[in-house]
Amino acid sequence: MGQLGVGRTGKTAVLDIELRRSGSRTIISRQYSEVPLQVQRALYPDAGLPGMAHVYVLSPSGGLLQGDRYKTSISLKDKAAAHVTTQGASRIYGMNSNCAIHKMDISAGKGCYLEYIPDQVIPYAKSRYFQEVRLAIDDDAAAVYSEVVTPGRVAMGESFLYDILCTSVRCENQDGSLRFAENARAEPRRMNLRGEAVLGGYSVHGTVYVMAPPESARTIEYTAGRIISHTDGILGGTSLLPGGAGITARLLSHRTDSIFKCIEGIAGACRMEMTGAAYPGIRKC
């Protein structure tokens, strides 16, 4: 497979956006991007939270190739409120050398509210993908961050045929104190990912992290547990994060839409608790 050299235009993508409150709305106050990552202007489709900015991360490339290096930075300040999602799934194409890497820095300052709910990752056969996420969430802010990973292009007969998929999430507060950290590595050619101690026969897995003050986190966890137990085709559970300043939810299913139904429900529980507004669902542009 031929490829451009690492660092060439189109191989190194950058997206850096800052959101602040301006009057009654959250606006994109700073924006810098290098193809293929880019964003549209902020939209305001939610009648329940008319000042919340909805931001859609776009990529005309269709997926990540070997040697791709992506860097995303999203920062919320001055009591900003934003819902950030992607235009579609992150497709990780097959590789015969090298790997694809995506590093993300996401921060929410005091009084801010963020929902970061991207579409699923689809690792193609022989792909290698590394994702590193650093969260900086103020103790007086609230944020939802989710990840969903599928087994591959199932319709093409590819299921758990990728080489390696590694994810790392680390969250700190405004003082740099660790809130939680987690690393995961999947190598289906070396591991039995369908085993009872891993995915238990399921094929799609999702994780949701909710960062919120302890008194709100307990309420959100209770509601999230009920949502999981009442969603068909889902095996999952919740737990409080260290120090009680948030929750994590683990989700397993055979269907991606069932996972996202749970994620939206949990995001809705957080939004209702923190803002008093209902969650209308993810709206794609």
Curated annotation (Swiss-Prot):
Transmembrane segments: none annotated. GO terms for cellular component: cytoplasm. Its main location: cytoplasm. GO terms for molecular function: nickel cation binding. It holds the Pfam family UreD. It is found in: Cytoplasm. It comes from the Archaea. Keywords: Chaperone, Cytoplasm, Nickel insertion. Required for maturation of urease via the functional incorporation of the urease nickel metallocenter. Belongs to the UreD family. This is Urease accessory protein UreD. It comes from Cenarchaeum symbiosum (strain A). The gene is ureD.
